Amino acid sequence: MGGMLGFFVRQLTFMPKPLPQNVRLDGKTAIVTGANVGLGLEASKEMASHGLARVILGVRTVSKGEAAKQEILKQSPNCDVQVWPVDHESFESMVAFGERAQSLDRLDIVILCAGVKNLVFSLSKTGHEQNVQVNHLGTSLLSLLLLKPLKDTAAKTGSPSRLTIVASEVHFWTPFDERKAPSILARLDEKDSFRGMERYNTSKLLNILWMRELSSRVTGNVVINAVNPGLCASALHRTDPTPGLAYLNKIFAWTPAQGGHNLTYAATQHVDEPGAYLSEQHLEK
C-alpha cells in the first residue's frame, strides 16, 4: 500500500527490531553525524552495545556531543567514543572533518544522519536554502570526503565498508518542479520556489538521487545505501508548527530508539545490495 495512507498503516503495523544479538561489530570504527540526539544517538548506542570498538560522533555543538558521549559510555564503557565538530552549513568545517578522518587507522561504517526540517524559507551562511544545504549538499560532500578511508579499510580487512544516508519516505511525495529550471540549485535558492514541507521532501529526494549516482560510480568494496527511518518522535520536528503534529506523533510515531534500529539495520545488513533503499527493515525495489 503506497502513498500517505500506506505510510500511516505501516507506522501502526510494523515495529522496528533491534539488531540480532549475533551481530558483532568488534574492532570496527563508525562515524555517525547528527549523533548528539535522536536517531543518530540511538544508532550509536546500539552499535556500541554490539562491540563497536570506536564511534565518532559528528556534531555541530561539542557540548551536546559530550553529553551524548557520556550516555553511550554508561551503557558501553569499553567503547572509544570521540566527539568531532562538524557544521553542515560550513564547507570549511566539513572539509576539516573529512581531512581529520583520513588519519583514522580504519573506518568501517558511516551513517550520515544530520538533518533539518525548516518549514520557513531561510538561507544558510553558504547562500543556499537551509534544507538543501544541510540535508543534501552537506550530506553529499561528507559522503565524498569519507570515501577514501572507507575504501582503504575495505582493502585492508577484505570486508565491505558501509555508507548509509538517512533519507525518508517523503521523497516520494514531491513534484520536484525545480528540476525543470536551467539551474536546479539556483532555483532552490530562490524564495518564490519554497513551499514549506515540500522543500524538506525535495531534499530527501536529492538524498536518494545522490546515493544512487554515487553508488553507481564507486568501486573499492564500499556498499552505499539509503534508509527511511520512518516517522519518529525526534528533535527533527521541534520547530514544525503543523497543526495536530503532536497528536499524530503520539499515535503513529516510533521512538527514537526504534528509528535507530532502522539505521543500524541499513548499516549492517544487505551487504550485497549497493544502491539500495531500505524501509521497514527490508529492501525496497
From Swiss-Prot:
Keyword annotations of the record: NADP, Oxidoreductase
Metabolic or biological pathway, per its Swiss-Prot or TrEMBL entry: Phytotoxin biosynthesis
KW Transferase (keyword) present: no
Biological function: Short chain dehydrogenase; part of the gene cluster that mediates the biosynthesis of the phytotoxin solanapyrone, a causal agent of early blight disease of potato and tomato. The prosolanapyrone synthase sol1 is a polyketide synthase that produces the octaketide desmethylprosolanapyrone I via sequential condensations of 7 malonyl-CoA units with one acetyl-CoA unit, and one methylation step. The octaketide backbone is further methylated by the sol2 O-methyltransferase to yield prosolanapyrone I. Prosolanapyrone I is hydroxylated to prosolanapyrone II by the cytochrome P450 monooxygenase sol6.
Protein name: Short chain dehydrogenase sol3
GO molecular function terms attached to this record: oxidoreductase activity
Family: Belongs to the short-chain dehydrogenases/reductases (SDR) family.
Active site (catalytic residues): S168, Y200, K204
Matches recorded under InterPro entries: NAD(P)-bd_dom_sf, SDR_fam
Coiled-coil region: none
